[in-house]
Amino acid sequence: MVLQYPQNKILVLSDHPHNFSKTQFLQDLFHCSSTGISIVKDQTWENRYYKVHFDLYIDSCKDIPVWVEEFITPECEPLRNVMAGIILITDIRQTKPQELLHQFMIAAHRNTFVVLVNVNEEVEQDEIDELNEIWSNAFTNVIEFVNWKRSKPTVNHNDYGEKLGLDRIQEIIDTHDWLNCEVLPATKIREEIPNEMPLEQIIRNLQSARLKYKSIENSSEADAFANEMADELSRYL
């Protein structure tokens, strides 16, 4: 897929009542303390399969639905096209995301992930799960609701071993189809694979390996990488 612009930006937006939550969120997820500026250049996201350089856009607004109305205008199309991901920090019971997501997602680039981070501590995980069920097949984009409680740690997985909270957001970024990532050598990947591995880790590794495989343009190199990773992961299956 050829894009007119490089998709190497992640936008983190909060409405004004939750600016403090955004500050801690940026520190916890991106280890970013430069919250007083709107653009933090050349950040690095790295896992065992690849690393990618991106710019972190930080913003706040009085009202997210009003911000969305401006964001989906034709004038903002160049901005939308460079967004690898958009993270909205809000109270989902106040924002009513079901109403704004329809128009928002029609305008968003199809390779942009969207995460709505709920900071209302009265919202239970069952309510988040229900929203994710509704939106899971609505668009081709990754759209996910995540509970994040600043005052107390969020349980990082459910009864099925699926990631929750910040761990789930990290997983979304890890498995995003980055178009400008630097693939790490297969030898380094093999060195980092432990002797024992839980099933959920195997699944994450398969997802990341798929991303690397798709980024290798030479078919022979891609096939060689696939065979190497199949051999490595077969030890744990």
UniProtKB/Swiss-Prot annotation:
Keywords assigned: Chromosomal rearrangement
GO terms of molecular function: protein-macromolecule adaptor activity
One biological process term in Gene Ontology: vesicle-mediated transport
Gene3D superfamilies: 3.40.50.11960
Record-stated family: Belongs to the IRC6 family.
Task of the protein: Involved in gross chromosomal rearrangements (GCRs) and telomere healing.
Protein name: Increased recombination centers protein 6
Gene: IRC6
